[in-house]
Amino acid sequence: MAARRLFGATGSWARWRAWELPDPAGSVRLHVRDYAKRPVFKGGKGAKGAAVGETLKDPEVCTDPVQLTTHPMGVNIYKEGQDVVLKPDSEYPEWLFQMNVGPPKKLEELDPETREYWRLLRKHNIWRHNRLSKNQKF
């Protein structure tokens, strides 16, 4: 019933500002609100979607060979402070150096008795099912 009253209004019930719709049946008034105003951006000629504030600068590139071999560059996420110093290899866990950082292994290269084999097989089956079901019609 409220919807009938709302749409039965003068047709201009969705204006840009909040106002009240009169209820013809009684003294109850419906409050209608709309979206907030668009933010005004400074700078640029008609720059749509331009961000207000500082312009971002590219990080400085380090060319010092001593610094590059003793510190990982770009790891420090804070504005102030020094970069982390690399430790000797003996202080890191052994599994870190056994990780596969190259291309992923193929299904034929894995042993069928391992969990990685079955996970990759399941992933391949899901990909195959998705390819086949893409062409099906309703």
From Swiss-Prot:
Transmembrane domains' residue ranges: none
Any one Gene Ontology molecular-function term assigned to this protein's record: structural constituent of ribosome
Location in the cell: Mitochondrion
Pfam families tied to this protein: Ribosomal_L37
InterPro entries: Ribosomal_mL54
Keyword Plastid in annotation: no
Domain of life: Eukaryota
Keyword entries, A-Z: Mitochondrion, Ribonucleoprotein, Ribosomal protein, Transit peptide
Gene Ontology cellular-component annotations: mitochondrial inner membrane; mitochondrial large ribosomal subunit
Transit peptide: 1-16
Family per record: Belongs to the mitochondrion-specific ribosomal protein mL54 family.
Complex formation: Component of the mitochondrial ribosome large subunit (39S) which comprises a 16S rRNA and about 50 distinct proteins.
Protein name (database record): Large ribosomal subunit protein mL54
